Amino acid sequence: MNESIECDVLVIGSGAGGLATAITARKAGLDVIVAEKEPVFGGTTAFSGGVLWIPGSPHGRRQNAADNREAAREYLRHECGAFFDAAAVDAFLDHAPAMVEWFERETCVKFVPTLYPDYHPTAPGGVDIGRSILAAPFDIRELGADMARLRPPLATITFIGMMFNSSNADLKHFFNAAKSLASAWYVCKRLVTHLKELALYRRGIQVTSGNALAARLAKSALDLGVPLWTGSPARRLVTERGAVRGAELQRDGKTVIVRARHAVVLACGGFPHDRARIGRAYPHLARGGEHHSPVPEGNTGDGI
């Protein structure tokens, strides 16, 4: 006998998009469930650099008061070329700064400015500072028992599991450790602290970048009482009269039908680990080429 559960909104996927959706829906008074196929939450976000490009954010306005909406729009028009979508760009520029303010006001998600320029700062409308922000560093002990379910960061962007804070002088101290006594002392203290964390928790607990963003979003969702079902892959969507009404999940070895009264949100990523689909999208693979992606192996295009 299949188990059946009802909610208002079912979110499939636990990266930044899925968790942000779940938090927003829960804040609106809706009953939300987040289902994640892998045993850890955070998705590709937890592996990523976690940089948000948000022209006009509160942090950006303080960092570069000369920047403005019109310049950001001109930059996007130049970068997008024939793919420029005026309605989508205007919606983004109008609402993205308010999104940042809302999350900082309503949740434990906090951001910090960065020194990153636009990808092409000399292009029309481009700037060399003020549009990119990062989640503030986070101590994952605040997740309590759920700390073990946060996807660890990508190993290649850590040093023996230690993450770096690119929004301050952290990295500079490591680069200057052989040249400056102050930097050498800073690095020694960081290493000792990190080794203690490894001994106690078997992982670094001071996280940055995308791992901090995923952790802060997860903490906010959990504090709101949103269930984060890990190890619960969606097998199929449930439809009635041509409309999606829920999804069939595998959870704890059982089939669970989750019926959503308002919406099913597919926030389960792309298909970098579906070789057949990649082969159809990139014909040159037939000639011997191959794409390798560092994203989690669970990204197989389930929602496409």
Model-predicted regions and their roles:
Residues 1-9, 27, 211, 215:
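Extreme N-terminal leader/targeting segments of oxidoreductases
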Residues 7, 28-31, 224-225, 261:
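Loop/turn elements at helix/coil->beta-strand transitions in domains of secreted/extracellular proteins
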Residues 9-34:
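N-terminal Rossmann-like FAD-binding beta1-loop-alpha1 element of flavoenzymes
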Residues 14, 56, 268-269:
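Glycine-rich, N-terminal phosphate-binding loop of Rossmann-like dinucleotide-binding domains
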Residues 37-227, 276-285:
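Conserved N-terminal/central alpha/beta ligand/cofactor-binding core
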Residues 80-85, 248-257:
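A structured beta-alpha segment of the ubiquitous adenosine-cofactor-binding alpha/beta core
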Residues 204-211, 223, 252-304:
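Glycine-rich loop(s) and the adjacent beta-strand/alpha-helix scaffold that form part
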Residues 230-244:
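A conserved short coil-to-beta-strand element within the FAD-binding core of flavoproteins
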